[in-house]
Regions:
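Conserved G1/Walker A P-loop phosphate-binding module
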Residues: 1-46
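Switch I (G2) and immediately adjacent beta-strands of P-loop GTPase domains
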Residues: 44-82
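Conserved nucleotide-binding/hydrolysis micro-motifs of P-loop NTPases
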Residues: 22, 76-77, 100-102, 141-145, ...
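Conserved Switch II/interswitch segment of TRAFAC-class P-loop GTPases
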Residues: 89-111, 119, 129-130, 142-147
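Conserved beta-strand segments of the P-loop GTPase G domain that flank and frequently precede/overlap
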Residues: 70-72, 94-98, 136-140, 169
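Canonical P-loop GTPase G-domain recognition
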Residues: 143-199
């Protein structure tokens, strides 16, 4: 996608944390907010009493003259419409793979759904050419005793025609590699942006900040 630019010259990018329910998306976002000092404003969350995201979590992070609006999606299967709404206009994706072996099918379901919705953006017809929207994977919960091997995750990505996807081994509750993954995704946003500028693409002005609209009853 293409970022927008505010009147003061600030570039605005949108990052989305994707993945199955309870995979660590909100925990990772909370770590960025509470521990890393990158947040500008409050962490907004729409969740149920158990901590499951009902629509999205949102955080604004600012680095120099670049702003990143970071969203998580609701991971439960019934919230497909909400995920599709949050996904619109995304500049980069971070897929949180739940390393718990018992969650294998949920990971596969979530990845397949993402490719159905956004495959034309995150896949490239030529592996030598990066896709329009960068995607990285956080293999989360690496502190658990029974975890899926990284090689198996790589096999899934290869079968999905994403063999060059970068994988970070993370533990969201302790922050292990969370900042590294976030910074990498943010950097990829900026790099893609300047690649597009070289090709002559224009940056649209930023509209007033809006959030995804919740579905009606």
């Amino acid at each position: 996608m293409c970022p927008s630019r505010r009147a003061d010259g600030t570039l605005v990018f949108k990052l989305v944390f994707w993945g199955p329910s309870m995979g660590g998306k909100t925990t990772a976002l909370a770590w960025v907010y509470e521990k890393e000092g990158l947040a500008s404003g409050q962490l907004q969350s729409i969740s149920d009493p158990t901590g499951r995201t009902l629509f999205f979590d949102r955080l604004v992070a600012k680095v120099s003259n670049v702003v990143f609006q970071v969203y998580t999606v609701a991971g439960q299967r019934r919230h497909k419409f909400q995920r599709q709404t949050v996904l619109k206009g995304t500049d980069a994706l971070v897929f949180f793979w739940d390393s718990d072996q018992a969650q294998w099918n949920e990971n596969i379901y979530s990845l397949k759904e993402l490719l159905q919705m956004y495959g034309n953006k995150v896949l490239s017809s030529d592996i030598k050419i990066p896709p329009e929207v960068p995607l990285i994977v956080c293999a989360n919960k690496r502190d658990l005793p029974n975890i899926t091997g990284i090689d198996k995750i790589k096999d899934v990505l290869k079968a999905a025609k994403m063999p060059n996807t970068v994988i970070f081994e993370t533990v969201a509750i302790t922050g292990t590699n969370v900042k590294r993954a976030f910074v990498y995704a943010a950097r990829e946003c900026v790099l893609r942006h300047y690649q597009k500028l070289k090709s002559g693409e224009q940056v649209p002005p930023a509209s007033p900040e809006t959030e995804p609209t919740a579905p009606g009853p």
